């Protein structure tokens, strides 16, 4: 009897945890409105290193990327001008090595700054993570860091 009661309690607890997890919001996608879809696609695919994934529209106006488990980045063509905004509003990608990423930027002729705005410098956060900031072809700010988690 005790064993059956314990089994029921464990099952009820697991069901409650599962139901609780399903009610939390999760990130599905980020969308960026871009002027030149091909330039933006090359930036995120070839420079940042994201994998493209199928998009349902097949209209030449969208590129989708996987950016994590069940999370995507959607590029949407049609912007009539560059994005203007402060780097406090940015998207961030973690890479195995900021130094190796900086080498890719140098080969591509793409400048970067640290948090203080110093050109070609790297910020080292208080937790030891190194980070840089750059802008994509449309002016969106992108942070690249070497955070492990």
Predicted regions and their residues:
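Exposed loop/turn and edge beta-strand positions of beta-sandwich/beta-sheet ligand-binding modules
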Residues: 59, 87, 128-129
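Bacterial Sec-dependent N-terminal signal peptides
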Residues: 1-22
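Mid-chain, structured segments of secreted extracytoplasmic proteins
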Residues: 62-108
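Core segments of cupin and vicinal oxygen chelate
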Residues: 31-72
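N-terminal beta-strand motif that seeds the catalytic metal site of vicinal oxygen chelate
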Residues: 19-38, 89-91
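Vicinal oxygen chelate
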Residues: 36-38, 91-138, 149
């Amino acid at each position: 009897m005790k064993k059956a009661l314990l089994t029921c309690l464990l099952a009820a607890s697991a069901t409650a945890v599962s139901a609780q997890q399903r009610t939390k919001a999760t990130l599905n996608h980020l969308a960026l409105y871009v002027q030149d879809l091909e330039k933006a696609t090359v930036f995120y695919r070839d420079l940042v290193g994201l994998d493209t994934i199928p998009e349902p529209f097949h209209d030449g106006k969208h590129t989708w990327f996987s950016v994590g488990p069940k999370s995507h980045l959607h590029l949407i063509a049609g912007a009539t001008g560059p994005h203007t905004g402060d780097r406090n509003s940015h998207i961030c990608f973690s890479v195995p090595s900021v130094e190796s990423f900086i080498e890719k930027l140098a080969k591509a002729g793409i400048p970067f700054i640290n948090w203080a705005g110093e050109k070609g410098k790297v910020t080292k956060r208080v937790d030891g993570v190194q980070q840089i900031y750059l802008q994509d072809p449309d002016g969106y700010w992108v942070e690249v860091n070497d955070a492990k988690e």
